Amino acid sequence: RSQGGDLYISAKLDERTDITYWFRRCMFNELYTFYRVGITRNRTALPTTQPEAEPAVLLNSTYSDNIGPFAIPGCGWCGGNHKYRERTARTARSEGYTLLADGNRIEGDTTLWANRVTVEAENVILDPTRPYRNAAGGEELRDTLCRESVTYTVRRNNIEVTASHRFCNAAPVTIAIYYGMQSMFEGETHVLTPGGAYTDWTEVAKASTFTKQEHPLFRRYVEKNRQGYQSTWLLPDEIG
């Protein structure tokens, strides 16, 4: 269901349960991405026709970055959910988005059935090395660091994400870190990282960070909470 610029999706998990998704402009920078993922009780054969309803179980909520930000030495983070130097100025903006159902463009407010829903979002990441003062004396970023294209493909209980960046900065910029993926699974208690540092279930409080250089075969990050599991998979192409 597309309604007022928001996109609501429901899909069957089993005969008693649906998964629901809510896409909208969100995070501090108002980028179009998935805002909420949850589970709804539904014993009918078809997915719920009210995917906008509050889910019985919240799986993901966008309280941080679900689109990778860049860390620029001396300038902090830009993109995703980040403010310039974590103060008040935005570090990215939405240039627009396209919604498709089975490859056909969704126009206006509508409700329909589909096997695959695709969201194509276009964002601009602003250059934090070139801040300005606006008329009110506040900080503002205006120059483009890169143009970010993100495609979300939703099938049943899976969101496949591909992102690309076309850099058009006016002067050289050093990127120290790029977070290609971040999970915001609610209430996680244990993690498992096959090929990584945690090859058995490990309590979240006892888990720490590790690098891809240390564990080059690592690609899957599995989380567990009291309701179920979530698995995040890095694709083998480019940086994942």
Which residues does each PLM region occupy?
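Beta-strand-rich N-terminal accessory domains
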Residues: 1-89
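Residues that act as N-cap/strand-start positions at coil-to-secondary-structure junctions
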Residues: 3-5, 144-146, 215
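Generic recognition of long tandem-repeat/solenoid scaffolds
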Residues: 5-12, 19-20, 30-36, 115-130, ...
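Short, surface-exposed beta-strand/loop "edge" segments at domain boundaries and coil↔beta transitions
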Residues: 13-23, 41-51, 125-139, 171-174, ...
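Coil-to-beta-strand transition motifs
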Residues: 16-18, 30-32, 143-147, 154-162, ...
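Extended, loop-rich substrate-binding clefts of extracytoplasmic carbohydrate-active enzymes
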Residues: 64-155, 170
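Acidic (Asp/Glu-rich), glycine- and aromatic
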Residues: 146, 158-198
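Trp/Gly-enriched beta-strand surface patches
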Residues: 197-240
